Amino acid sequence: MEFNSEVKKATNSIYKKISDIMPEIEWSTHAPYIYEINKLKKEKNAVLLAHNYQTPEIYHGISDFSADSLALAVEAAKTKADIIVMCGVHFMAETAKLMSPNKKVLLPDMLAGCSLSSSITGEDVRNLKKKYPGVPVVSYVNTSADVKAETDVCCTSANAVKIVDSLGVKKVIFLPDDYLAKYVATQTDVEIISWKGTCEVHEQFNDREINEIRKNNPGIKVIAHPECPPDVINASDFTGSTSGMIKYVKENQPEKVMMVTECSMSDNVQVDNPKVKFIKPCNLCPHMKRITLPKILDCLKNETNEILMSKETIEKARKSVERMTEIGR
């Protein structure tokens, strides 16, 4: 595809926004796709939803709405578009389908999975419910529709503590992220029965890395995602969901900050906070990085990679997500 004068003119305002983090030679390879995608989505009445971990050319270049998992689910439920293209991973596209079952939901790469989602099955949940009869199941939204169908209420990292406390019980089964479960347990009096799932990005971080960053950057603020190991949480100044981390930077405007999460998010937040210096520990999510501009254009143009589920699964799984969105943040 050609980076001609028409493409350059149409995408120039976008590039101005992200030029500090992307050289023009790289932009010239992205701009033709951005131009075509933005034109095509209007023709097809499509909406592009992007998770905070998407790369800047997607996050700032083509997405109509960029957010964390909770906000993406809410947006999917209320969109007036005919087609939803989920620039994220498979469970996010499934969740969009649950919230808008009559919409066509597309995922640019069907192999964009998640280590948390793949760590547990619906059968695993049924076995846990037999082992702990009567104990409500809270599942992280990073799970398959089959798991959500066996779940009482879903949660995200933004509202996990609120969800658990809202149930008014002494004990819950919390799935599948063991580190998030440990974090929630420190914030509530409810007993947490956890599962041994982990995020392959966040589990790589450790407190030694943080201490070294602090040593080389006096005064830096370290903010971590609750999917990180406990030693990382304890070594950080703030712990929060991706939306919480974005809010922290926006409101506090620290001189320097280290965001202990997926690397692309720091790039995206840096664009909107140019006065803040970001020290970036670059752990990338290989699943999120399967989503690229060429794949987005192809799936939108040909309407391929549609998310399909049985009516029974949608009806069962949707209840747990709707309950989550009703409780909110």
Question: Could you tell me what each predicted segment is?
Answer:
Residues 2-259, 263-329:
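Active-site loop-to-helix "anion-binding N-cap" substructures in soluble metabolic enzymes
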